[in-house]
């Protein structure tokens, strides 16, 4: 006789707060040998960066109809896109950039004044306690 298996429980359904992280939108790092580094990652790990990064698609767990992409790319060591002292930067996909920035401001998080609007979405940047720059991306509506 088998012992009964516990039922998998799900957390109670609650109203989700807007301005939350949905997933990782990008991993960016610097290299003094950008082209060779791209070739190495393509050859050995299959991350083929053809100029705009390797695109790694995924779907939301709670809404599989919503597809996103995580971008992996190598920047030149001289890039000003993120601070010289920072060898990498993580981009997080968010559901509501304005709501998140409003909440982070109230919580005293350091927020970069720069904003960027592109055809593929809106961007903002914040800093963690160690001063690491973090990119926030709200994708454009399809």
Whereabouts are the PLM-identified features?
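Vicinal oxygen chelate
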Residues: 2-32, 77-142
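A short, acidic/glycine-rich surface segment
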Residues: 11-12, 75-78
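Residue-level signal for short segments within beta-strands and strand-turn junctions
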Residues: 60, 76, 138-140
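Short secondary-structure boundary/capping segments
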Residues: 62-64, 79-82, 115
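Core segments of cupin and vicinal oxygen chelate
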Residues: 18-22, 28-72, 106
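Short, acidic/polar N-cap/turn motifs at the starts of alpha helices
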Residues: 53-55, 89, 114, 123
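Membrane-topology and secretion signals of cell-surface/extracellular proteins
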Residues: 47-50, 83, 141
């Amino acid at each position: 006789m088998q012992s009964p298996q516990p039922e998998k429980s799900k957390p109670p359904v609650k109203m989700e707060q807007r301005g939350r992280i949905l997933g990782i939108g990008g991993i960016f790092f610097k290299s003094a040998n950008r082209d060779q580094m791209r070739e190495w990652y393509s050859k050995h790990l299959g991350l083929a960066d053809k100029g705009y990064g390797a695109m790694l698609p995924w779907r939301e767990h709670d809404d599989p109809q919503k597809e996103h992409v995580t971008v992996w790319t190598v920047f030149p060591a001289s890039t000003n896109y993120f601070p010289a002292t920072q060898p990498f930067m993580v981009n997080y996909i968010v559901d509501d950039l304005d709501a998140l920035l409003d909440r982070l401001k109230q919580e005293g998080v350091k927020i970069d004044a720069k904003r960027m609007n592109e055809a593929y979405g809106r961007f903002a940047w914040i800093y963690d306690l160690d001063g690491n720059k973090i990119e926030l991306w709200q994708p454009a509506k399809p």
